[in-house]
Amino acid sequence: RPTTEGIFKSLDGHDPLGALQDIDLILDIPVKLTVELGRTKMTIKELLRLTQGSVVALDGLAGEPLDILINGYLIAQGEVVVVSDKYGVRITDIITPSERMRRLSR
């Protein structure tokens, strides 16, 4: 007689091993990390007047933490550092791993 044991997942909702295996499936998926220095709004006229050497003022204050986004969702804040002659960011505040996964699954 055929059996379905091992084919279908348990419906009781208590499968911690399955949850770990599910997360292993997504661990190598690339995500986009963005560090945001600040934002501003401008008119089309102002945009068209920009030239090399133009300075655009942003809403972020000097010394204020920078927003760190993953796929457009805020997950942390940090400060600018230099790493081997390149910019980097030191994380100063971050949401929990479970909250990060929840935001990415939206």
Curated annotation (Swiss-Prot):
Example GO BP: bacterial-type flagellum-dependent cell motility
Key words of the record: Bacterial flagellum, Cell inner membrane, Cell membrane, Chemotaxis, Flagellar rotation, Membrane
GO CC, one annotated term: plasma membrane
Signal sequence interval, chain numbering: none
Chief location bin: membrane
Localization per record: Cell inner membrane; Bacterial flagellum basal body
Gene3D superfamilies documented for this protein: SpoA-like
SUPFAM superfamilies assigned: Surface presentation of antigens (SPOA)
Keyword Cell inner membrane: yes
Pfam families reported for this sequence: FliMN_C (PF01052)
Gene Ontology molecular function: any one: cytoskeletal motor activity
Function: FliN is one of three proteins (FliG, FliN, FliM) that form the rotor-mounted switch complex (C ring), located at the base of the basal body. This complex interacts with the CheY and CheZ chemotaxis proteins, in addition to contacting components of the motor that determine the direction of flagellar rotation.
Family: Belongs to the FliN/MopA/SpaO family.
Protein name: Flagellar motor switch protein FliN
Organism: Pectobacterium carotovorum subsp. carotovorum (Erwinia carotovora subsp. carotovora)
